[in-house]
Amino acid sequence: MNLKDYIATIENYPKEGITFRDISPLMADGNAYSYAVREIVQYATDKKVDMIVGPEARGFIVGCPVAFELGXGFAPVRKPGKLPREVISADYEKEYGVDTLTMHADAIKPGQRVLIVDDLLATGGTVKATIEMIEKLGGVMAGCAFLVELDELNGREKIGDYDYKVLMHY
């Protein structure tokens, strides 16, 4: 199945000069959505994953069904002020400044094998901050999986030597 057939391209969104890759059509098509989830599950199966971590919000959409299929837990990564209990945080650089991500301080137990699942790998800031928090909690990085990678932004450099899977490259 060619998943790119289910990605909408919107020019100059959210601002001039940006090409936005919209995964909504993929999510709206049951066959394409399940195919994408199965591809990530297949990648994760041999990694003996205990926990899926997904950054908000589209990481939830992709990560939760992967966790369900694997019989693993799911831990959300959110912006500050969105999680109700004690959190840890990590800062990351965006195009115009610094932002912060958080996750519950008890989300990962030491030694748990963790797979990060998200819709998009762009500059890599989100995944780098997420890796930092997982390692701070004693988690073992099993890898990362993304629906889409924007190759020209070199986000893969922020993943370092960790294994990762991408379903579509742009």
Curated annotation (Swiss-Prot):
<keyword id="KW-0328">Glycosyltransferase</keyword>
<dbReference type="InterPro" id="IPR000836">
    <property type="entry name" value="PRibTrfase_dom"/>
</dbReference>
<comment type="subunit">
    <text>Homodimer.</text>
</comment>
<comment type="similarity">
    <text>Belongs to the purine/pyrimidine phosphoribosyltransferase family.</text>
</comment>
<dbReference type="GO" id="GO:0044209">
    <property type="term" value="P:AMP salvage"/>
</dbReference>
<dbReference type="InterPro" id="IPR029057">
    <property type="entry name" value="PRTase-like"/>
</dbReference>
<dbReference type="GO" id="GO:0006168">
    <property type="term" value="P:adenine salvage"/>
</dbReference>
<dbReference type="GO" id="GO:0003999">
    <property type="term" value="F:adenine phosphoribosyltransferase activity"/>
</dbReference>
<comment type="function">
    <text>Catalyzes a salvage reaction resulting in the formation of AMP, that is energically less costly than de novo synthesis.</text>
</comment>
<keyword id="KW-0808">Transferase</keyword>
<keyword id="KW-0660">Purine salvage</keyword>
<comment type="pathway">
    <text>Purine metabolism; AMP biosynthesis via salvage pathway; AMP from adenine: step 1/1.</text>
</comment>
<dbReference type="Pfam" id="PF00156">
    <property type="entry name" value="Pribosyltran"/>
</dbReference>
<dbReference type="GO" id="GO:0002055">
    <property type="term" value="F:adenine binding"/>
</dbReference>
<keyword id="KW-0963">Cytoplasm</keyword>
<dbReference type="GO" id="GO:0016208">
    <property type="term" value="F:AMP binding"/>
</dbReference>
<dbReference type="InterPro" id="IPR050054">
    <property type="entry name" value="UPRTase/APRTase"/>
</dbReference>
<protein>
    <recommendedName>
        <fullName>Adenine phosphoribosyltransferase</fullName>
        <ecNumber>2.4.2.7</ecNumber>
    </recommendedName>
</protein>
<dbReference type="GO" id="GO:0005737">
    <property type="term" value="C:cytoplasm"/>
</dbReference>
<dbReference type="GO" id="GO:0006166">
    <property type="term" value="P:purine ribonucleoside salvage"/>
</dbReference>
<dbReference type="InterPro" id="IPR005764">
    <property type="entry name" value="Ade_phspho_trans"/>
</dbReference>
